[in-house]
């Protein structure tokens, strides 16, 4: 039903706005060098493997095909929320490898959402895109994200002071969510993925007094709308297609695991971490969670993903999200 789909989209905006709010930019800047190396490694290998799987299974003719690029983009996703919860429960959020994973996950999401927005722009075009067209989409996407983040960051103190005058946390939440929805609407107006607006304004407001004030009510509203988003993504899955295309789903899942664990893990070694800590970093970057689901939902809505490819993405997301906390807990428990 259109109403449920609309509520699901509201849930997606709230989810990404919250992810942005929870992104600690100061922490990221402290370990920015290591986090950047890990994020690049954790994006490059999954992206290449995503392209390779699509071409080898015959879903795409070449590596420049939009569907192949979209699948590669989905494989780059890392869930900040799941990674934070796991490291928090293990009391390892403040450790060097924990902070690096968190910083890399933030950068991973920023780059992944930028990449997604570029691919959506490519999909929206009915004509064959030239290099100039693609360059325009990239410049537009980067310009929008940087512009919104910088303006938001510069104004976050003023916005926070203005909003905090409303003593009711409920009023603060309504005003903050209004900003998220307006930013999403502006992104859509420019032909970009709406989630880039919500995520960017969330990052801009992260660490502010306002972010602290709306933390509790944000969890309350998330508990209402976010499950609706997960229900709508589940409703789009045709279980018969998963059963029919399980081989592709299995290979995509293996590519997703190898891409993150090896890509981020080897990058961790290059960043100066010990082998076991590098493995923890690789596994910490593994869960795809809500980020991949949002990307997949946008993919099916924009026509970049077919039903059977969507089912394979859901399978890969579910398995990687399930495996990561178990393996990470085991790796930390076996520390001397």
Predicted features and spans:
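Transmembrane helical cores of multi-pass secondary ion antiporters/exchangers
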Residues: 1-336
């Amino acid at each position: 039903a259109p109403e449920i789909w609309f509520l699901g989209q509201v849930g997606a905006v709230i989810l990404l706005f919250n992810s942005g709010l929870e992104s600690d930019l100061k922490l990221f800047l402290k370990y920015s060098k290591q986090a950047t190396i890990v994020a690049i490694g954790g994006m490059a290998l999954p992206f290449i493997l995503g392209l390779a799987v699509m071409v080898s299974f015959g879903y795409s003719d070449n590596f420049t095909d939009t569907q192949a690029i979209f699948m590669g983009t989905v494989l780059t996703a890392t869930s900040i929320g799941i990674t934070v919860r796991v490291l928090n429960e293990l009391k390892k959020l403040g450790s060097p490898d924990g902070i690096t994973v968190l910083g890399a996950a933030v950068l991973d999401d920023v780059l992944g959402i930028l990449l997604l927005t570029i691919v959506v722009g490519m999909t929206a075009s009915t004509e064959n895109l030239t290099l100039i067209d693609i360059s325009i989409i990239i410049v537009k996407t980067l310009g929008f994200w940087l512009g919104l983040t910088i303006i938001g960051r510069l104004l976050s103190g003023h916005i926070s002071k203005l909003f905090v005058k409303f003593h009711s946390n409920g009023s603060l939440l309504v005003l903050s969510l209004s900003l998220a929805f307006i930013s999403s609407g502006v992104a859509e107006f420019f032909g970009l993925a709406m989630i880039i607006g919500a995520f960017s304004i969330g990052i801009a407001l992260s660490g502010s007094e306002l972010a602290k004030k709306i933390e509790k009510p944000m969890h309350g509203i998330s508990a209402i709308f976010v499950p609706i988003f997960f229900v709508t993504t589940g409703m789009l899955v045709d279980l018969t297609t998963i059963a029919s295309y399980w081989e592709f789903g299995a290979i995509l899942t293996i590519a997703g695991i190898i891409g993150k664990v090896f890509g981020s893990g080897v990058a961790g070694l290059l960043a100066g971490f010990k082998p076991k800590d590098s493995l923890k970093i690789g596994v910490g970057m593994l869960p795809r969670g809500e980020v991949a689901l949002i990307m997949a939902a946008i993919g099916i809505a924009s026509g970049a993903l077919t039903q059977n490819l969507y089912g394979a993405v859901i399978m890969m997301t579910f398995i990687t999200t399930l495996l990561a906390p178990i393996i990470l807990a085991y790796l930390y428990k076996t520390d001397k």
